[in-house]
Regions:
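Class I SAM-dependent methyltransferase "Motif I" SAM/SAH-binding loop
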Residues: 333-337
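Conserved SAM-binding loop of SAM-dependent methyltransferases across substrates and taxa
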Residues: 338-348
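Class I S-adenosyl-L-methionine
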Residues: 7-328, 360, 367-370
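PRPP-dependent phosphoribosyltransferase catalytic core
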Residues: 357-390
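Conserved SAM-binding motif I beta-strand of class I
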Residues: 350-354
Length: 390
């Protein structure tokens, strides 16, 4: 049965200054573009609404394969780039308690970004609890409810829990951020995302509490009265025969070694010692399929001194798992440049943008350390013009 949100009548989020975004959608801010002479990668020093409109007008519609953005969270804080004893202002999040102004800002940007993404592309929007749910409704409208893939929960990292100093609390400590993942097309498929996670082989009970009568059959003289066996009868009988062959002819070597010698695709079932239930063998694993709870890595890093620097492991996972070599990756709130550095390392093309001089300077330095030289001062062709943004 189709979701109600997939019908012609859409659910929309309305706010106090609804439609204000239309008044700012065409604003032309000063822009500066830094371009690599060989790869064509672009770094914009400008307001990102100007940059995405420039890309639309210069042939990038439907060309970007993966977008990761980390917009302000609506905390109302000032952020810095801290090096030794020097603090350089990076940006100020002015949206605390100003939900309508935040929505006026983010809506037109997401609307244009949606046009830039390729048919098989995706967007990942990194937020926290302050404005996550408002942005989710907006993205359902712009990208389509049916194109929502996951909310990814990511561990913040080394953030101290300050609640220990109080005798009572009014809320729990927040230890996670969230990333909203949308695809451009509902039919797009991805390979299983795998992460390293070494697990030894083990025997486990073959019975499951899922109640399917058609999966109840006799094994070792026993038929379950409720629940079911995990596999079909034919598959289970073959696994029993496999184990009999191993015990009869190869018991002098460990079962795991025998499994490796037989192309690592044999399955085994045996009668559990001392009880009537069968058990099946789970082979060792070096990788497991990733789910949406990412507690094995951290969202933030502290290598550059930039307050909101994202961890390279986070971007390696997103870019490595959900894009291909030579794909075009973009980050329109690029901050310290982690997305661009990782994209460069993984063999992707990239586009970055930030309005902060501090962020652009830091990004340039990081890219230079990634064997990437930038040609500065190029101005865009067409009607956009202007000098450097301070």
């Amino acid at each position: 049965m189709p979701s109600p949100l997939q019908k012609k009548s859409k659910v929309k989020l309305c706010w106090a200054s609804d439609n204000e975004y239309k008044k700012t959608n065409g604003i032309k801010e000063p822009i500066r573009i830094l371009k690599n002479s060989t790869s064509g990668n672009l770094l914009f020093h400008s307001d990102n609404l100007t940059s995405v409109n420039y890309l639309i007008e210069n042939g990038f519609e439907h060309k970007i394969d993966l977008v990761y953005i980390d917009p302000p969270f609506g905390r109302g804080e000032k952020y810095y780039h801290r090096m030794k004893n020097v603090e350089n202002p990076a940006f100020e999040d002015v949206f605390r308690g100003k939900i309508h102004e935040y929505l006026d800002m983010i809506y037109p940007r997401l609307e244009v970004i949606q046009k830039l993404i390729s048919a098989r592309g995706s967007i990942f929007v990194h937020l926290d609890w302050h404005l996550l749910h408002y942005v989710k409704v907006i993205m359902d409208e712009i990208f389509g409810y049916e194109n929502f893939r996951n909310e990814i929960i990511i561990k913040r990292g080394r953030r101290k829990n300050l609640l220990y100093q109080f005798k009572s609390i009014d809320r729990m400590h927040v230890a996670n951020d969230s990333i909203l993942w949308y695809s451009k097309s509902a039919g797009t498929k991805f390979h299983h995302p795998l992460v390293k996670n070494k697990r030894n082989s083990k025997w486990m009970g073959f019975w499951s509490n899922v109640n399917r009568p058609t999966m109840r059959y006799e094994l070792f003289g026993f038929v379950p009265e409720r629940g079911q066996w995990k596999w079909s009868k034919a598959r289970a009988l073959l696994a029993i025969e496999n184990y009999k062959v191993y015990v009869g002819k190869f018991a002098d070597i460990p079962l795991e070694e025998y499994w490796r010698r037989t192309s690592q695709n044999m399955e085994f079932i045996r009668k559990r010692p001392s009880v009537k239930y069968p058990e099946y063998w789970i082979p060792p694993k070096t990788h497991v399929i990733l789910d949406n709870i990412w507690t094995d890595i951290e969202a933030y890093s502290y290598s550059t001194g930039y307050d909101t620097e994202k961890h390279e492991q986070l971007l390696e996972r997103i870019i490595g798992q959900f894009s291909r070599a030579r794909d075009l990756v973009a980050d329109f709130f690029c901050g310290s440049g982690t997305t661009l550095v990782v994209a460069q390392r993984l063999g992707r093309n990239w586009i970055g943008c930030d309005c902060s001089s501090t962020a652009i300077q830091l990004t340039e330095r990081r890219l230079e350390r990634s064997d990437f030289s930038l040609i500065k001062g190029l101005k865009p062709r067409g009607k956009y013009c202007g000098g450097p943004v301070s």
